[in-house]
Amino acid sequence: NLFFKKQNMKKKSLSAKKIIHNKLLIHLKNPLISKIYTEFQNFNKFNLNKYNFSVALSGGADSLALAYLSKCYSISNNIKVKYYHVNHKLRKESSSEAKKLKILLKKFDIDCKILNWIGKKPKSNIQSIARVKRYELISKECLKDRNNFIFIAHHLDDLYENFIIRLLRGSGLKGLVSFNQFKTNYDHKLTIFRPLICFTKNDLNFISKRVFKFKFEDPSNKNTNFKRIRIRNLMNNLKLEGMNFEKLKLTINNLSDSNFTINYYVNENIKSNSKYFNKKKYYILNSTFFNQPHEIVFRSLISLIKKIGNKY
């Protein structure tokens, strides 16, 4: 009798999951959601469809949209996806919000693991330090699960913000376009994917509102003490003034192409004009190595120094 009871419970559980999954998948019939989901699946070109991956969730509309899209993908492709939320404990409400997020997501068959930032909290440069800690915690958890791929919900508005911030800092070409990538590496062990980098926050808000009907707003997103928030407000004002952000995206893409070209010639310079001796870990450079444009020589030298120092 106990065996049959367990079997019945298992069947009921599977049946309940199937109902939840069908309710999630039906939203893909919406034209905008379908378009975003199709674009989201572009990570398949990196041959990840056979691997499990992880998703970082903040509880905001953009990360909830990512939770939905990745869940649909996992259902359709029988892939395991791990979900992580970092509780920074920078606000009194953060722990209760993290618990509430976990409970609400469970209703959609999304099991979100809460990672807590334990230890002394910074009093200055808070957002930057919190971001580093967030990546550290998620990276550690991913590697523990033998999972090298993490998806994050950076979108087009984030790309614009990052570009303007780096422009104000006086960043060079490489720095200006560093965010405009679908895939980057973190700490040599983890690959970060930004599958939503081509979509606006409004697009992701649409998904979140339609599917989940809830989201968590971090009060710091309205705190003008943070430069990022001031830049965000500036961008909103520029939109009201009629600024065409599609042209800004075109500019960023053109700069990215230029950066790609420079990287090509850097690799050619290293390959043709240097020789590496692995046993003693040193390079011999010929005179032609330095007969290149300044940026090519500079990046080539940086690349060689990193290789010798085992810092890729």
Task: Please tell me what each predicted stretch does.
Residues 10-13, 17-166, 202-203, 209-210:
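ATP-dependent adenylation/nucleotidyltransferase module used to activate substrates
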Residues 86-89, 218-220, 288:
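Short strand-loop junctions, especially beta-strand C-caps/beta-turns
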Residues 92, 129, 194-195, 292:
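Residue-level marker of alpha-helix boundaries and capping positions
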Residues 143-153, 161-255, 281-285:
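Catalytic subdomain that performs nucleotidyl-dependent activation
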